[in-house]
């Protein structure tokens, strides 16, 4: 559904990889019940979706093929989506220091076919934006094993190299930890909004005291 967005971190252990899940632009409420519609294969836990087996099933008796064709017939001129809704983001697990270089691997930024192939990605850490080119190649050495990237997570990869300027710590002259929100944009729009809650921790040094200032 176009009202659902999520992020995942493929470097995390199984069961901990989903790092955010938004419905209608807001984080899901763990105290609410949600209705999920899909084919029986996925609802039975296929493709490693075991969480879908925990709900109460309602079988409608329709074939996905028939409903898909009905939808296309009722929506003349429908166009393929360009904005991805599932993005792989691996952020530093430890705090970073200003001017310290770190990398942010990204996956699933593009569709494998059609108009939704982004050429660029922008990752913002608070007000600091860093840009990178996107690799949309479908060639993959590990296409059929667990080291797969494209087969598992889709096309559109980038490894962003970033370092944050000392100015990010201007609001924290006393030093200590600073939390910066992380957002991700492609050529087609925002794919990881601030509401996703992804962050980077920055360790700010104590600001140097100006000559003549009172201690």
Predicted features and spans:
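Catalytic centers of hydrolytic enzymes
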Residues: 1-214
